[in-house]
Each structure stands twice: as structure tokens, then as C-alpha cells.
């Protein structure tokens, strides 16, 4: 039986317009996973309920939905608080006599959130990730990356970062596929991998508790390499594949494969990139045991042969994972 048809009224009088109709889909998605409701349960609201005009959950939804539509600044809400689509998504109304929270109200909300509550919010992302699976996965590949968040003015905690050549924060992100697992705001005077081991340890422990048989793979570039991370992964049975900075020993070991890729490219007159892979057993001075190093020598048409190295616990299979999804975390940050 077909559902009854609903009348649709169209007029061209102008009236209250919006260019952000997609926010209505966010509102429906939020009702499904109860994200803003669960965030609201984490953040303590010290206000007297007798003297407030806006529920904290509505303020949270207002801020999140706006950021998702590229309205990052609180000042944007001077106008957005009257936007009919945002009103409908947040409060299920388009009544202009019931505007959303002001910029100052949202600013006070953001500034009263504690570090403990932020940690609990990140744990919520892990729970949402677990809930997204109907059946236990056999393997989880966790990507980690950091990016620059340029500061404006004299923001507290702003430092100059030589790599990004600017004053910025250096937030840390953990992803699995298209899902965010953790987002940690950090000052940029720390190393790229600062705090990564502790966060990964929490995520891995929680996933193992839910799915005891799942295989967990940690994947990151050379900035996240540390002997502590290798020790943790190997002790707890997790796989890893990490970028590895070159040194004189590794350059000597990989000289033949670099030369071979160059010669093959030249002799065959190829105009396509040519790659060779080789696996070595290498033991750094601080390592108690040797580990596998995978070397990729790549010759591009307009460049000489380039060489990249990664260390891993299980070379061939895990490197295929890396080759297939090498840019996953980077793409999530664009």
C-alpha cells in the first residue's frame, strides 16, 4: 500500500531564505545516533534552569551543525541564530521569535568545558565507532596524523612550528576508514607523535575488550615512530606499519634497489612511474631485536629514483595495506 501523498506548497515571495538546507540531514542523522544528546550528558551545565533561554543540548547542536557547514567562527551566529534551516534542525521550528543562542552564549559554553570532559568526548567517538558495526570486524587499521591549525592574534598556547613555518596548534587525529576515533588539540612546540602512544593504547584496549579476536594495525608516518610504540604493539600483539627515517646504514642496504629502478626505467624508455620493493632485516642500535624494513624505490618520469622506508612487524601483507590506503588519514584532514 502506497503512503498517502502530502501536499507541497511553493511560493516565490522571498521571505526567510537559507543556503544551508543540508543541515536538515544533519539533524536527522543526529536523531539517529543521538550525538548531541550524548555530548550534552557529558558536559556539566552549571546554569540555573529557571533563568535560561536555551537548553545546553540545543547550543551544542547549533555549534556542531554550523561548523559542519564551514561556519567555524562564533561570530557567524549573529546571523545564523535566525537561519530557518538551522532552527528547524536544532529545535524543530522555524519560528523567528525563537532564535537560537547568541555568539556570547556559545562562547561561554565552549570556555567552561573542562579537559576531563574533552577526554570523555573523545571516548564517545570510540563508542560510536564500535556501535557502527553490526558484526565484529576481523581487522581494524588505525591511521594517525597531525596537521597545522593556524592561530590568529595572540591566542593562548600558540607557538611557532618550523615544519609548517607558522604559528599554529598541532592537533592529533586518529581515524579508521572514514570514522574519527580521537581528536586531540595540542600546542605545536611538541613533536608530531607526542601523546600518540597513550591514545592508541586506550583505543586498542577498548576495541579488544569489545572484539577480543580483532587484529589491530597501527599506521603512521615517520613522525610517529618511537621505540615505545614498537614495544607496546609487540607486547600486546598489535601490528604496525610506520615510516622510518633513513640513515647511512639503510642507504647502503638499499643502494642496489635504487640503482636497479633507475636502470630499468632508462633501459625500457618507460614514461610511467616504476617501483621496486625490497624487504630487509635491520636492527637499530637501540633495538633489542631486528625488525623488517620495507624499501620502496620509485622512479618518476621527471625525477631521479626516490627511496622510502617503512618498518613493520609483518612486512608483505601489511605493506599491501599501506600501499592501498597510504593517503587515508591525510585525505581526512584536507
What are these regions (language model features)?
Residues 201, 232-235:
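Short, electropositive alpha-helical surface patch
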Amino acid at each position: 500500500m502506497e503512503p498517502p501523498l502530502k501536499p507541497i506548497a511553493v511560493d516565490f515571495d522571498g521571505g526567510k531564505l537559507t543556503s544551508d538546507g543540508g543541515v536538515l540531514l544533519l539533524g536527522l542523522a543526529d536523531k539517529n545516533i543521538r550525538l548531541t544528546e550524548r555530548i550534552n550528558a557529558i558536559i556539566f551545565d552549571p546554569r540555573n534552569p529557571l533563568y535560561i533561554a536555551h537548553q545546553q543540548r540545543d547550543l551544542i547542536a547549533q555549534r556542531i551543525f554550523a561548523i559542519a557547514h564551514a561556519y567555524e567562527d562564533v561570530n557567524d551566529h549573529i546571523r545564523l541564530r535566525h537561519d530557518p534551516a538551522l532552527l528547524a534542525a536544532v529545535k524543530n521550528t522555524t519560528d523567528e521569535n525563537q532564535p537560537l543562542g547568541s555568539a556570547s552564549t556559545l562562547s561561554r559554553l565552549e570556555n567552561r568545558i573542562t579537559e576531563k570532559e574533552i577526554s570523555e568526548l573523545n571516548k564517545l567517538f570510540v563508542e560510536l565507532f564500535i556501535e557502527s558495526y553490526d558484526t565484529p570486524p576481523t581487522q581494524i587499521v588505525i591511521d594517525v596524523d597531525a596537521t597545522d591549525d593556524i592561530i590568529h592574534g595572540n591566542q593562548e598556547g600558540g607557538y611557532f612550528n618550523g615544519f609548517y613555518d607558522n604559528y599554529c596548534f598541532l592537533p592529533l587525529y586518529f581515524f579508521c576508514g572514514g570514522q574519527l576515533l580521537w581528536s586531540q588539540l595540542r600546542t605545536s612546540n611538541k613533536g608530531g607523535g607526542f601523546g600518540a602512544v597513550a591514545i592508541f593504547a586506550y583505543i586498542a584496549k577498548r576495541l579488544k575488550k569489545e572484539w577480543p579476536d580483532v587484529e589491530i594495525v597501527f599506521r603512521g608516518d615517520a613522525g610517529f615512530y618511537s621505540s615505545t610504540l614498537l614495544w607496546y604493539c609487540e607486547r600486546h600483539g598489535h601490528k604496525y606499519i610506520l615510516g622510518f627515517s633513513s640513515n647511512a646504514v639503510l642507504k647502503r642496504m638499499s643502494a642496489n634497489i635504487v640503482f636497479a629502478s633507475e636502470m630499468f626505467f632508462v633501459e625500457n624508455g618507460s614514461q610511467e612511474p616504476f617501483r621496486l620493493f625490497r624487504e630487509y632485516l635491520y636492527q637499530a642500535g637501540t633495538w633489542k631485536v631486528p625488525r623488517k624494513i620495507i624499501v620502496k624505490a620509485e622512479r618518476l618520469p621527471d625525477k631521479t629514483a626516490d627511496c622510502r622506508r617503512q618498518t613493520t612487524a609483518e612486512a608483505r601483507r601489511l605493506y599491501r595495506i599501506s600501499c592501498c590506503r597510504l593517503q587515508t588519514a591525510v585525505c581526512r584532514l584536507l
